[in-house]
């Protein structure tokens, strides 16, 4: 006879452990347990049955895998947590005795420091694994880099996050790894490609951040501690892979003056390298030197091949290699107009590095300098200027510099009379930069709004700058990661390209009907107002609360004589009566014809005769309805030949496509009304 199993020794009760049991088993406090789980990447699990997993009568809410907690028993961080607890007790004892100096000494010299290097190596055995988990790290660190310092967020943490983020941005600028960017309500999205891995992160706008009390900053600070260590490892590996020293030189004074990216100086790892910011020009010079050496070698090889009579075969091989080594990216176009939109390849590093290379930009005071500087430098621009108010590190602070080719402006077009006058500079300040009056256009310079930079990057080419001139209505700024699907709405395409057959005509007819109905309502309303006014006039003629005063005998005789004169009006009254009867008959027949036309589905004109245009519209509507009916019958015929599973799948697809087409039709009708209103 088998042994009876005890309850809670197998199954879900053995595989799961509650949070209280885990804290007791590890012998640490609950905040330390949370920190340890964040560092090690252990998170709560949801069992199939909480009642079976719980060993008590009341089912608990938080469960962990028993094996995960068993794995944490051998973690070296547990000893650090216990040492911190012991030092905290000693500090509390010293403060209780009034020994403030001893408490400060214990906190400074004996407080254990946590090192997460071994945790990073355990969680990310390869560098690709670390790159795949870099999205959340960058988003959180960029968020803390833009937060104001307070009791919850110390200044040291903010400075560390800013330094790591700027170092990562310098790598993207040097290697031209940035690919796309998008302006959203939440912030600015960036996407970079590093060693074949797409990394996307979010950077908040530089508004004044208000720190709320409902945010648990202890949990976020734990993530910041882990992610700063991770990004430090990643930056070191990235800088080493391109031959740069890490960390780069950092100028504290320049950073205090608002230089940001310009406060860092990159230098190579070779012994004879001079500290400098490595740019694309340096790599081009080294590559040109290698080309000169290779040309000499190639000339000697050509002589040997020519003497051997193999020059013809060599020419064929070189032709093949030149065809294969072309750096242009192929564009995939669908073979049929109804086919799906094919995904296009992204920009290469050389193309991204030369997009803004030949230009010199000047950023106005009202434009966001930090994201624009990062984007322009990441896509090849070496000369970026801005006003001295925005900080150090500019190529030029003079707005009238003739070398400037593009100026980024984000202010409305105002008349010159409303602009303030520029105060005259002091005579002793002879070296002051010349100020330009707001709204002044310098000849030979292209003025654009900031969205032009983002749209050029997402399109992979320079778009028309006249569409982004100051004061112009900007084109729609669409997400580069959402591609227009078949049957969906595309804001960039015109209405004629997206409308279905006969959709525009039907929309015009419906608009005309709505206008006619509105006119009829206005006419009836005006008629009712006129009738009410006439009734009020009749009421005003009555006296003393609506009672008429009895007239005298003379008045009665006069009224009787007038009635006798008005009794016979000749043949005019008979003609008016016949005319009113004819009008009633015409209205009755017109109403009958309207009912017949409505039953037949045809438009009806008030004059009783259908015009040629209305006949054409009616025939076109009939053709469209017949075509739709034929397509529906064909689909029903095909569904009859399908199995039940495939038929259900087809119905789901048709339902989703119908919903998508309805949403697209709503957006098209809205756009049609807006364009019609703008045309008026």
From Swiss-Prot:
PROSITE patterns: BRCT (PS50172)
Basic residues composition-biased segments: 616-628
Chief localization: nucleus
GO cellular component: nucleoplasm; PeBoW complex; preribosome, large subunit precursor
Lineage: superkingdom: Eukaryota
Domain BRCT: 351-470
Single GO MF descriptor: RNA binding
Entry's localization field: Nucleus, Nucleolus; Nucleus, Nucleoplasm
GO term, biological process aspect, one: maturation of LSU-rRNA from tricistronic rRNA transcript (SSU-rRNA, 5.8S rRNA, LSU-rRNA)
Stretch list, region Disordered: 310-330, 472-680
Keyword Transferase found: no
Coiled coil location: 496-523, 613-680
UniProt keyword annotation of Chaperone present: no
Residue spans of biased composition, Basic and acidic residues class: 519-529, 586-596, 629-639
Extent of Acidic residues compositional bias: 497-518, 530-543, 551-585
Pfam families reported for this sequence: Pescadillo_N
Record InterPro entries: BRCT_dom, BRCT_dom_sf, PES
Keywords carried by this UniProt record: Coiled coil, Nucleus, Ribosome biogenesis, rRNA processing
Sequence similarity: Belongs to the pescadillo family.
Protein function: Component of the NOP7 complex, which is required for maturation of the 25S and 5.8S ribosomal RNAs and formation of the 60S ribosome.
Subunit composition and interactions: Component of the NOP7 complex, composed of erb1, nop7 and ytm1. The complex is held together by erb1, which interacts with nop7 via its N-terminal domain and with ytm1 via a high-affinity interaction between the seven-bladed beta-propeller domains of the 2 proteins. The NOP7 complex associates with the 66S pre-ribosome.
HAMAP family assigned to the protein according to its UniProt record, in alphabetical order: Pescadillo
Name recorded for this polypeptide: Pescadillo homolog
Organism for this UniProt entry: Aspergillus clavatus (strain ATCC 1007 / CBS 513.65 / DSM 816 / NCTC 3887 / NRRL 1 / QM 1276 / 107)
């Amino acid at each position: 006879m088998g042994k009876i199993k005890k309850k809670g020794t197998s199954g879900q009760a053995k595989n799961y452990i509650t949070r209280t049991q885990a804290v007791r088993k590890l012998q640490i406090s609950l905040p330390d347990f949370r920190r340890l789980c964040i560092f090690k990447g252990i998170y709560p699990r949801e069992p199939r049955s909480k009642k079976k997993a719980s060993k008590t009568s009341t089912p608990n809410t938080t469960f962990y895998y028993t094996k995960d907690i068993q794995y944490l028993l051998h973690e070296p961080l547990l000893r650090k947590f216990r040492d911190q607890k012991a030092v905290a007790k000693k500090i509390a004892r010293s403060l209780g005795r009034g020994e403030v100096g001893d408490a400060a000494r214990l906190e400074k010299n004996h407080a254990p420091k946590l090192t997460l290097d071994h945790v990073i190596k355990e969680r990310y055995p390869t560098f690709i694994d670390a790159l795949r988990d870099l999205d959340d790290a960058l988003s959180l660190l960029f968020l803390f880099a833009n937060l104001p310092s307070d009791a919850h967020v110390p200044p040291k943490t903010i400075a560390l996050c800013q330094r790591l983020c700027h170092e990562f941005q310098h790598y993207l600028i040097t290697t031209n790894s940035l690919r796309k960017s998008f302006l959203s309500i939440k912030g600015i999205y960036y996407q970079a490609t590093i060693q074949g891995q797409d990394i996307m992160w979010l950077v908040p706008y530089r508004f004044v951040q208000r720190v709320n009390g409902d945010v648990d900053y202890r949990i976020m600070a734990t993530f910041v501690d882990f992610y700063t260590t991770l990004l430090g490892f990643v930056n070191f590996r990235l800088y080493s892979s391109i031959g740069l020293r890490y960390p780069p030189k950092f100028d504290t004074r320049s950073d205090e003056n608002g230089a940001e990216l310009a406060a860092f100086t990159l230098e190579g790892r070779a012994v004879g390298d001079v500290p400098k910011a490595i740019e694309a020009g340096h790599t081009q010079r080294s590559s040109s030197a290698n080309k000169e050496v290779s040309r000499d070698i190639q000339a000697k090889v050509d002589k040997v091949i020519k003497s051997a009579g193999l020059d013809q075969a060599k020419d064929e091989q070189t032709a093949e290699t030149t065809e294969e080594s072309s750096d242009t990216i192929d564009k995939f176009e669908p073979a049929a107009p109804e086919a799906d939109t094919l995904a296009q390849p992204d920009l290469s590093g050389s193309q991204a590095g030369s997009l803004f290379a030949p230009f010199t930009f000047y950023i106005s005071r009202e434009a966001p300098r930090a994201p624009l500087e990062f984007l322009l430098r990441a896509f090849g621009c070496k000369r970026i200027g801005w006003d001295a108010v925005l900080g150090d590190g500019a190529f030029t602070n003079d707005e009238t510099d003739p070398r400037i080719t593009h100026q980024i402006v984000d202010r409305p077009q105002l008349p010159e009379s409303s602009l303030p006058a520029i105060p005259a500079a002091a005579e002793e300040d002879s070296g002051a930069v010349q100020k330009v009056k707001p709204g002044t256009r310098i000849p030979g310079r292209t003025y654009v709004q900031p969205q032009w930079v983002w749209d050029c990057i997402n399109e992979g080419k320079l778009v028309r700058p006249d569409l982004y001139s100051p004061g112009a209505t900007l084109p729609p700024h669409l997400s580069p990661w959402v591609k227009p699907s078949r049957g969906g709405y595309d804001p960039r395409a015109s209405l004629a390209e997206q409308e279905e057959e006969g959709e525009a005509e039907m929309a015009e007819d419906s608009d005309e009907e709505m206008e006619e109905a509105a006119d009829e309502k206005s006419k009836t309303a005006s008629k009712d107002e006129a009738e009410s006014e006439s009734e009020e006039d009749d009421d005003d003629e009555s006296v003393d609360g609506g009672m008429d005063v009895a007239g005298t005998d003379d008045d009665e005789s006069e009224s009787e004589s007038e009635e006798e004169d008005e009794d016979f009006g000749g043949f005019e009254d008979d003609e008016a009566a016949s005319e009113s009867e004819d009008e009633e008959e015409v209205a009755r027949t017109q109403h009958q014809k309207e009912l017949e036309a409505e039953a037949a589905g045809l438009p009806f004109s008030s004059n009783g005769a259908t015009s040629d245009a209305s006949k054409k519209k009616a025939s076109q509507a009939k053709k469209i309805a017949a075509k739709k009916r034929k397509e529906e019958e064909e689909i029903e015929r095909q569904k009859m030949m399908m199995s039940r599973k495939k038929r259900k799948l087809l119905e789901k697809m048709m339902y989703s496509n119908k919903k998508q087409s309805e949403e697209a039709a709503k957006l098209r009708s809205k756009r049609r009304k807006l364009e019609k209103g703008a045309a008026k």
